[in-house]
């Protein structure tokens, strides 16, 4: 049987296009824009146009349960992301998984900007002007745990500072401070990608962080 996927915040349907082309998946989606929905529909079984903040997901998708629900770059845009977590619990199959991605508010470039008294919203990136919620590794796992979810796996996307929107800010730090920050856990993690299940005791210890990246810090600091 085909894998059933619900893509929340599907946008123009890039994920659906990939899954429909390369995998045996039946995909439903939801997006805020009718224009985006029109682009997505060729690859999705159903695409609903609605606001995640106010819609009743359980009612919109009441006849289905899913093997995977995807919230890719979604939770940070919501005032009450816990509402979506509650709805997803009802829509997952008994063995289903929630796939999420969120930006890392502990990225060293963002922290460097804060240290210089700035918190500058941008058109895109970690401080996208539409972001309402911010997460670090610990706070993400705590947030999920408090709302009845556990992390089964957690991966990261890293971005070197010269490739980020914060390079200029980091360049103004004293060298000793820059070296210290680059050595902290998740310093260069730009985004977290997680797999979660309802009620699962977090397999990735919420207090666990990767070891200090001394070698990486030394190498990277030599760029500045």
Q: Over which residues does each language-model region extend?
A:
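Conserved glycine-rich SAM-binding loop
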Residues: 11
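S-adenosyl-L-methionine-dependent methyltransferase catalytic module, highlighting the catalytic core
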Residues: 14, 35, 39, 52-55, ...
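Class I SAM-dependent methyltransferase SAM/SAH-binding core
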Residues: 14, 18-56
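A short beta-strand submotif of the Rossmann-like class I SAM-dependent methyltransferase core
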Residues: 68-74
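Conserved beta-strand/loop positions that form the S-adenosyl-L-methionine
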Residues: 8
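Conserved alpha-helix/loop element of class I SAM-dependent methyltransferases that forms part
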Residues: 1-2
